[in-house]
Amino acid sequence: MVEQLTMVSLEEQLLLNSFEKVFMGAAGGGATLDITDVFSTYLYTGNSASQPINNGIDLSGEGGLVWIKWRSGNNAFGHSLHDTERGVTKELHSDSTPAQSTEDRISSFNSTGFSLTSNTETNLNANYYASWTFRKAPKFFDVVTYTGSGSAKTVAHSLGSAPGMIIIKNTSVADPWAVYHRANTAAPQTDYLVLNTSAATVDSAAWWNDTAPTSSVFTVGTDHSVNANGENY
């Protein structure tokens, strides 16, 4: 059985309203985008059999990311992240540091969401899960991959505006999750956060090269977590 989350708090509704304003005309003369076209929070119950999650997000045509978390039931599973750039079988865990692994949790990205396999971590019978789906869209969300060089470099993105938040994971080996946020400090390009720990902000030029992101690129420094030579991110 699949159910969609329909109740939101006042704060969440205000956030959705602000997103709707951002997307008005964001397509650059094409169809107007609504928040429901590019983002979904969806609750479902596992059935230990293949099942589609029809949340209305076009992942097969536009690309994006699916983030799944076990909520309650007989087991405690971690966060499971899959995106269209790395492929449906490649998984990352946002609460830990390992490299990506090959798993059979999601079988396909679809024009109306995604489909689950019978894998227990994301679809165990009578267990409850939450999924968050982000579709690629200008001024909202993008997923990019790159190979590190060991020297400070820029990485292109397709947002068309300076990103407010950047999350980077080394997919080749175990490394912390690097986080940039424009409201983190007075000079956020000089600082970093780590997604998988509770550590406070750290000042270091090795992560963002003390360079603010732009509407077309962001900059990474020389730290292994963001730019090791020959490793993938």
Question: Which role does the model predict for each range below?
Answer:
Residues V2-Y233:
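Surface-exposed molecular-recognition determinants
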